Amino acid sequence: GMGGDGGRGGQGGLGGSAGAGGEGGGGVKCNGSADFCDRRFDEVSYPMTHNAMSNAEDGWNLPNQNFNIVTQLEAGVRGMMLDTYDEDGEIVLCHVLCGLGSRPLVDALTEIRVFLDENPGEVFSIIFESYIENSETAAAVEESGLIDLTYAHTGGEPWPTLRELIEADTRVMVFQEKPGDEAYPWLMYFWEHAWETPFSFATPEDFSCDPNRGDPEAPLFLLNHFLTSPLGGSSDLAEMVNYNPLFLERAEQCQEEGEALPNFVAVDFYDIGDLFDVTQSLNSR
């Protein structure tokens, strides 16, 4: 076993993720594929988890996911929607009712930072639904060390390629759904750069590709692909919509209607169904 570990360690020097160097003469992989390296950030589709923090593995009630943030990262999730609150003076992740589950924001961001340090060929995105001050978000990003990996994009400019982001080691996109602050150029206002589908669907028949928030001319497109019950997340609802052909057909329909690649494909219970097959299909056209 020792020899195998040594072999893996030897590849780290290439600056790619695990397995870099396998292709004809040592090309670096970007988010798992050499094919993505020269695509701009907005030319790739990323598997995303809705309410990523709310998960059964960590004991949350009414969770949106089965597994926690570290497990999600290891499975290949490359975007997370995270809700931030001030709970009695502590900055935490929770979903509406912090009594159902909460966690210090800095702890979760530190886990993300550690994973990205260990996987230098990976680009990752966060979309904050923030109910805290921008300065409080910034403090947690700084304390976790994630600040060193952030990228600040200028609206209207072309997005860099994954290779450029990886070589500069600015591999973390931090977006939020409310305006940012000139003091924190890396804390990007999502709706300056992106648009989305609606997200309040009770049944599969309700699904729509209509523009909701954001400008459909914006370069990034968020596909909300989850059903909501009055109580929140439901693995039974995920079972209904997370499988192909329904899932891929909706993604392709929205790509066609919106004339835009779904960049962030957001689901509940990512481990149920075909999320990774869908993003792979979108990325292989």
What are these regions (language model features)?
Residues 1-27:
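Ser/Thr-rich, Pro/Gly/Ala-heavy low-complexity intrinsically disordered linkers and tails
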Residues 27-285:
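Catalytic cores of phosphodiester-bond hydrolases, prominently lipid phosphodiesterases
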